Structure formats: C-alpha cells, structure tokens
From Swiss-Prot:
GO molecular function: 3-isopropylmalate dehydratase activity; 4 iron, 4 sulfur cluster binding; metal ion binding
Entry function: Catalyzes the isomerization between 2-isopropylmalate and 3-isopropylmalate, via the formation of 2-isopropylmaleate.
UniProt KW keywords: 4Fe-4S, Amino-acid biosynthesis, Branched-chain amino acid biosynthesis, Iron, Iron-sulfur, Leucine biosynthesis, Lyase, Metal-binding
Disulfide linkage: none
Organism of derivation: Methylococcus capsulatus (strain ATCC 33009 / NCIMB 11132 / Bath)
Residues annotated as binding [4Fe-4S] cluster: C348, C409, C412
Known catalytic reactions: (2R,3S)-3-isopropylmalate = (2S)-2-isopropylmalate
Protein name: 3-isopropylmalate dehydratase large subunit
PROSITE patterns, A to Z: ACONITASE_1, ACONITASE_2
Cofactor(s) required, per the database record: [4Fe-4S] cluster
Keyword GTP-binding set for record: no
Family membership noted in the UniProt record: Belongs to the aconitase/IPM isomerase family. LeuC type 1 subfamily.
Domain of life: Bacteria
Length: 470
C-alpha cells in the first residue's frame, strides 16, 4: 500500500463518519468569522434555540466593511455599519472572541489568524470566505464555506464534505532576485488555468516553495482557490515552527514540545501517489502581470498582451476578446506600456510586514508619478501597521506621496469606501481581477508588492529585475 499525501493525513485525522455515498462528516478545529457571511448564521442559531458547540474554536474580526481612513468617525455607509455592529452584538451575545475595530489586533481575517497563532498545523480551518485556503501554508486543511455551513459549524463543529483529489505542484530550483511568491502563484495559475485545480487540493512543494518565508507561502496558498482548488497546502518545516512559536494562541511549554513532535509528520510520505503532478522550473518565472479579467490571463512583465486570434479554443478566444474589450487593451501592447491610475498595496494576499518591506524598498527615495492619482498602502492588521511604523516604513511611503491607512480589506473589493471609478486602471496586490471587483468599471492588474510600488513610481509597469526599481 502506498504512503499518504499530506492532504490524506489531514483528512483522515478529522473524519467522524462516512456515509454510504462516500460523503464524510469531518470535525472542524478552528472557525474564523467576519461580518459579511455570519449574520444569517447567528440568526439561524437564535431561531433554533441553539448556541455555539465550541465557543473557544471561534475567532471573529470585522474586515470587509471597515474604513481604512478616518476610522474615528465610524462607518459612514449604513449597510456596512450594520454588518459590523451585528457582528459585535453576535459575538457579545454568544461569548465569541472578537477583535473589534478599535483593537490593535484587528485586521484582515486571513492575516490575524496566523499572526495570533490561531492557525496551527494539522488543523481543519474554515471561514465564510473564499481565501481561507491561505492557512494551508501551515500544513492545515483550510477552505472557504457558505453562510449555511457557517451556521452548521457554529452549531455542531462539523461539516459534511466530499474528499477532493490530490494534486502536487512542484516548483524546482530557486526564484530569481525580484521574483516573488506572488509571481510564482500567478505563473502556476497561468500554466494550469483557473479550472486546473477544480476537484483537487493542491500541495505546493519543491525547492522554491521551501525557500519561501511563511508570508510567501501564505500568498501562494491564498491564491490556490484562484486555480480552482478546494485548498492549498505546504508541508510543515522549521520555517513553520519558527513563525508560530510564542504566538498568543499557540501552545507553550510542554504542550508546544508535544505539538511539534506531532506536527513533524505533516508532510507527504515519499511513496505517496498524487492524482495529478505539475512540474515548474522556478528559474523560468519572471515578474507577472495580469492583462485580463481572470487570474489565468497573465503574462511576464516583459511580454505583450496576447492576441485572441492565436487561441484555437473558441471559448477561450471569446473570453480573451471580452477581457480585452473590458480592459481597453489591444493585442500586442507591451505590458510595460500599460499606464495605471491607482495603485493598491494590501489585501489578504499581500499585506503582511514582508510585503510592505518589499514595497518600501522600491519606493524609498522616490516620488509617486504625477499621473498616478492615488497609491494606497493598507497593512493587513493593526500589529502589522505598528511594526511597519516602528521600522519607519510609513514615513517612506508618506514621503513618496503614498497614503498610509488603517487595516482592512480595502480596495481588494468594492465593499467599502476604497474603490475604483469607472475606467480607472489599478496595479493591485490583491487576488482577483474580475470585472468590477475593485469598483464598477474598474480595471485591475494583479502584481506583487514590489511591482505595484514600481508602477506607482513610474506610472506604468516596469520589470523590477531589469533595473526598473525606480
């Protein structure tokens, strides 16, 4: 019998019951909650006369609707304000720990979970949010769920799920200087497509993955969902353990030692068999820029906008044509010739301290281009913001004409005051470039923090590996 994959191990450890049709009841170790997908779930509990099964397994934070500027004035939009106030009330009523808007620990849910050590190896972790896959960077099985499932987890601490297939994405070799985890995962999505991981859980492995920091691994797993995968995983190693030790929710003392011993087995066995294997040479990856309205519509920064006429598949060709029309781009346009109106550095993909340091390194000593209307820097949490300010990064950005904001989801999605106007083009470190994602009629190009920072300085995309560091 062949060995087990990391996904097999995590799944098997959490199966409570198997039905005749193969569906499984699995136990959930950690439930992360935010203000958008939880109100109906809590109301369902009240109507049924239920209470959360394990209060301590839940951690809540408001992030999607919170303002990132003038926070002391409160939330102007009444719908956004109601969602945040409802979360506050629900957490108070049911005794759930919440990092409120005025708490320094508040931030984007997929930033604060790992930051607090609430995300731990071997766990099953769910949240009513697509990018819950982020937490798989810690050797945890993490995936997004719907509102009805949020209620189910609150009430029972279990979920009915079907096991996905196993995919291995092995990235061998080392990334070139200036090429980041964001470029790596965009290149993967460009290779396999947004449906390439459908029905699979993807384990990311290889020298390039092992060489990433935890911040980088979180970026990769964050965007596994954009490849269609149910979840993304990275095996536990010393990098994982070094990141987690001493964090508030992590075990300590003898419990830490016991946990580390258990976590050391959280890797795929050498003889494990995967249903699908994708091999990528890290040296072939260059800084990436999306040109269309799907993360798979991506090319290296030194390339040109592709021509739909060269695409044999009629469905893909039509998709490309529609994307070019929406993005107002012509085939053959050099990526470096695309000018941007706004720049957004933030989101659960790229708003951690390492991301801000990378952007600040590019910005230092330069000014935002006059043609760029706005360059937003939004830390992923209050603690990230505080650390960045202790390092003087806020001054670097402010002196360059960037805006330094409070933590939140911000311009990743048009659900708060930070959004694009119709026709505006944005270099964004977020994870989705769908039509209208950052605002009605807004045009999004996904890039790394360093690439976004360089675009803000130059007013257009530049290759930061070819002397384009402003």
């Amino acid at each position: 019998m062949s060995g087990k994959t990391l996904y097999d191990k995590l799944w098997d450890d959490h199966v409570v019951h198997v039905d005749a049709d193969g569906s499984c009841l699995i136990y959930i170790d950690r439930h992360l909650i935010h203000e958008v997908t939880s109100p109906q779930a809590f109301e369902g509990l009240r109507m049924a006369g239920r209470v959360p099964w394990r209060v301590d397994a839940n951690l809540a934070v408001a992030d999607h609707n919170v303002p990132t500027a003038d926070r002391d004035r409160g939330i102007a939009d009444p719908v956004s304000r109601l969602q945040v106030e409802t979360l506050d009330k629900n957490c108070a009523d049911f005794g759930i720990t919440e990092f409120a808007m005025d708490d320094v620990r508040q931030g984007i849910v997929h930033v604060i979970g790992p930051e607090q050590g609430a995300t731990l190896p071997g766990m099953t972790i769910v949240c009513g949010d697509s990018h819950t896959s982020t937490h798989g960077a810690f050797g945890a099985l993490a995936f997004g769920i719907g509102t009805s499932e949020v209620e189910h987890v609150l009430a029972t601490q279990c979920l009915v799920q079907r096991k996905a297939k196993n995919m291995l994405v092995r990235v061998q070799g080392k990334l070139a200087p200036g090429v980041t985890a964001k470029d790596l995962v965009l290149a993967v999505i460009g290779r396999i497509g947004t449906a390439g991981g459908t029905g699979y859980t993807i384990e990311f492995a290889g020298e390039a993955i092992r060489g990433l920091s935890m911040e980088g691994r979180m970026t990769v797993c964050n965007m596994a969902i954009e490849a269609g995968a149910r979840a993304g995983l990275v095996a536990v190693d010393e990098v994982t353990l070094d990141y987690l030790e001493g964090r508030p929710f992590a075990p300590a003392g003898a419990l830490w030692e016991r946990a580390v011993e258990a976590w050391k087995d959280l890797h795929s066995d050498p003889d494990a068999v995967f249903d699908k294997v994708v091999e990528i040479d890290a040296a072939s990856i260059k800084p990436q820029v999306t040109w269309g309205t799907s993360p798979e519509q991506v090319v290296p920064v030194d390339a040109e906008v592709p021509d739909p006429a060269t695409e044999a598949d009629p469905v893909r060709r039509e998709s490309m044509e529609r994307a070019l029309q929406y993005m107002d781009l012509l085939p053959g346009t050099p990526i470096g010739a695309i000018r941007v109106d706004r720049v957004f550095i933030g989101s659960c993909t790229n708003a951690r301290i390492e991301d801000l340091r990378a952007a600040a390194e590019v910005v230092r000593g330069h000014k935002r281009a006059a043609s760029v209307k706005q360059a937003l820097v939004v830390p992923g949490s209050g603690l990230v913001k505080r650390q960045a300010e202790q390092e003087g990064l806020d001054k670097v950005f402010l002196e360059a004409g960037f805006e330094w904001r409070d933590p939140g989801c911000s311009m990743c999605l048009a659900m708060n005051a930070d959004r694009l106007e119709p026709g505006e083009r944005c270099a964004s470190t977020s994870n989705r470039n769908f039509e209208g994602r950052q605002g009605y009629g807004g045009r999004t190009h996904l890039v790394s923090p360093a690439m976004a920072a360089a675009a803000a300085i130059h007013g257009h995309f530049v290759d930061i590996t070819e002397g384009g560091r402003a």
